[in-house]
């Protein structure tokens, strides 16, 4: 599986999708829209890429998830490439790709620069760790976007929280909140998706589990940038509504108008030693009332 993932990446750099071991009939999407790999942007624009910074492999399901920074010609402004692949009899039957180029693609966060170092920590867990069972990792994935699974999850004090490679710092719209990176949390009030794709990749060795959820929300102005806030996070949206009214009344800065949006999310969790060790929220935004072709 490692060789197949690296082969996908190498074929992009070589601009040669024909070298991929595709099944006679395969499913493929790029940034949520279906396309033949021969028509995808990744094979046209990526000029440099190395090995995955994060690689989760599910030997039972024949699936893998990978993420890394890639160059599309400008090494100073790299792109985050994320992908999920399914293999049957050494042939690719499913390929789900996302290319995030800046903060707006995700909704707030992004750092292709920080990604390699942050993800490297997760690829080298302690050798003496207590691994979670496949059944528990599945249940963890099921609970992530569930409205009925009330799994209680312990969070490690050093749990790494990232969004698109970035250890998120949020000083708030008034600029007076903490400048320390945010930590992980397992809140009771979280975005839900009853049609979430659960346990797409379960890596029992490293403790990774990958889940997909389609999350409706709204893009709000946020200081001089913008932020995607899921509809389920009502208090956060209400607070932002207040700030928007204050800002409009003061008329001191220009802000983007609020818009409805949908977050296509591939979330990665890492769990071992009986605690959540890492949480990665990876989103690609589209318009309101959208869904996924994988459903």
Predicted feature descriptions by range:
Residues 1-295:
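C-terminal and inter-domain tail/linker signature
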